[in-house]
Regions:
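Conserved catalytic SET/PR domain of SAM-dependent protein methyltransferases, capturing the structural core
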Residues: 1-127
């Protein structure tokens, strides 16, 4: 995902609905690593609201240990907002920190961005 236009820190870049997925609805199978597993986010500690699948572009943002966006609670129920952590140039890739132990090797990234503490919502589900 890349920025179509330059934007300032704090800009909401996307607001997307989520589909809440109760943890009990996941199938107990081997191997655990299926395609849908890659697209589940932590959502809530509330029973039957533990996970969510993001709609819109949410599930195709790449990971970076030096992200330029974060996922926050959206203003409407069952939504996530993507918010710029710093000024972003037009054409710059938008990345967020998955917040879990990575299952792939991360490439070096020259840009360092200071980021706010992250809430639990929006972190990739640890598999």
């Amino acid at each position: 995902v890349v920025a179509r236009a330059a934007c300032a820190a704090g800009t909401e870049l996307e607001r997307a609905p989520v589909i809440v997925v109760p943890a009990d609805d996941l199938l107990d199978r081997e191997p655990q690593d299926t395609v849908p597993d890659h697209y589940l986010l932590y959502w809530s500690d509330e029973p039957r609201q533990e996970l969510a699948m993001g709609c819109g572009l949410l599930m195709i943002y790449n990971h970076s240990a030096h992200p330029n966006v974060e996922f926050t609670d959206g203003p409407e129920p069952d939504t996530i907002s993507v918010v710029a952590l710093c000024a972003i140039a037009a054409g710059e890739e938008l990345t967020y920190d998955y917040g879990v132990e990575l299952w792939f090797k991360e490439a070096a990234h020259p840009k360092t961005v200071r980021r706010k503490a992250k809430a639990t919502k929006g972190k990739k589900r640890k598999r």
